[in-house]
Amino acid sequence: MQEYINFFQQHLLLSSAFVIILLLLIANEIRYRLSGIAKLSPRQVTQALNHEIAILIDTRARNDYQRSHILGAMNIVESELLTELKRLEKYKDKQIIIIDAAGQKAHNIALKLKKQGFDNVAMLSGGMQAWLAEGLPIAK
């Protein structure tokens, strides 16, 4: 234990940076969990689609969507999300699953929908990259 204390004392800047980064990671994970936005695996998304209890919103750029997308997904880019709310109103009784490229923007987009009154919002964990990595079907 004394070795750790000596290391921290001798490398104060490095140790402080480590602690700060660790705290930020923990805070970010807590924020995700408290937001009420579910992170779904590609398999869970497939099950939701098979049971027809969810719709998919692909928020990637139009050219990325046109190259490949999950069958049945609607393409609504993030900048148009708030103007497309009327189009989504009819799906309020279903789960809305947000897809992005790698799962990094989907949470914030899902939060925007939640603030607009859509209670059952989730995100594809890992985004389209995770879907493709699982070898699941796509439309071209």
How does the language model describe each region?
Residues 1-39, 48, 54, 62-95, ...:
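Rhodanese-like catalytic fold shared by cysteine-dependent sulfurtransferases
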